[in-house]
């Protein structure tokens, strides 16, 4: 695999640029996340290369760029029909990129050891985990991928709350249902709902680490 692109000032180790306003200092410093595991960073860089090569546009790790990843997935679906093995190259790269966008947006940590099936993203401020690579595989195949853990792992006591929230979301067609942007919107709704519930129940200051998910 080719080496990662050089990091810019303010990058987080995955090639993502951390926003910084040189004119106005924030009142409080946001949580600083460590760089992702090297296995993840390499795949993020690969996704950036794939998209830049095809569309001549650079991904920057922000949620706004997921619409471009959606288009890449649509083309990957066509390639998958002709060459099913292509999913083993594309899904890990797209999953790593999507997972890293979510990690930066919502504060989470990677478990990226062993096979890609075992990878997880563990959230810090809510009890939530899943496998972003599994989400990427389902985006390509447009069906549930058994054993890839793309489903949401939640506190059982909060499952009904989240089921109700997801049931209230607008319907989307099959093409959009599995796309990265739709998945990001779902995770946003889940995180916001769980945070509101935690604040209302007086547990808003509780955080989670990887050990809490064992």
Which sequence ranges carry the predicted segments?
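A recognition module on extended beta-rich or small alphabeta surfaces enriched in W/G with H and D/E
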Residues: 2, 123-206
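Intrinsically disordered, low-complexity segments enriched in small/polar residues
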Residues: 8-13, 105, 200-202
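Generic structural signal for hydrophobic core residues of well-folded globular domains
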Residues: 76, 101, 105-106, 139-143, ...
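Aromatic- and glycine-enriched beta-alpha-beta binding-site module
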Residues: 89-132
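N-terminal low-complexity, intrinsically disordered segments
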Residues: 3-91
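Short glycine-rich, low-complexity/disordered patches
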Residues: 63, 206-209
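C-terminal structured domains
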Residues: 136, 211-214
């Amino acid at each position: 695999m080719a080496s990662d692109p050089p990091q810019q000032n303010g990058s987080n180790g995955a090639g993502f640029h951390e926003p910084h306003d040189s004119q106005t200092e924030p009142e409080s410093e946001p949580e600083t996340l460590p760089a992702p595991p090297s296995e993840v960073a390499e795949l993020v860089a690969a996704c950036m290369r794939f998209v830049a090569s095809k569309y001549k546009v650079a991904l920057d790790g922000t949620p706004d760029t997921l619409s471009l990843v959606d288009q890449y997935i649509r083309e990957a679906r066509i390639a998958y029909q002709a060459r099913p093995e292509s999913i083993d190259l594309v899904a890990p790269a797209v999953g790593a990129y999507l997972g890293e966008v979510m990690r930066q947006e919502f504060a989470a940590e990677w478990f990226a050891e062993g096979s890609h099936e075992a990878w997880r993203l563990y959230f810090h401020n809510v009890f939530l985990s899943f496998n972003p690579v599994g989400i990427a595989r389902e985006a390509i195949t447009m069906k549930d991928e058994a054993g890839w853990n793309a489903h949401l792992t939640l506190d059982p006591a909060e499952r009904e709350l989240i089921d109700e929230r997801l049931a209230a979301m607008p319907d989307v067609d099959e093409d959009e249902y599995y796309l990265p942007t739709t998945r990001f919107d779902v995770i946003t709704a889940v995180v916001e709902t769980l945070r509101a519930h935690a604040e209302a129940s007086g547990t808003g200051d509780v955080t989670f680490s990887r050990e809490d998910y064992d």
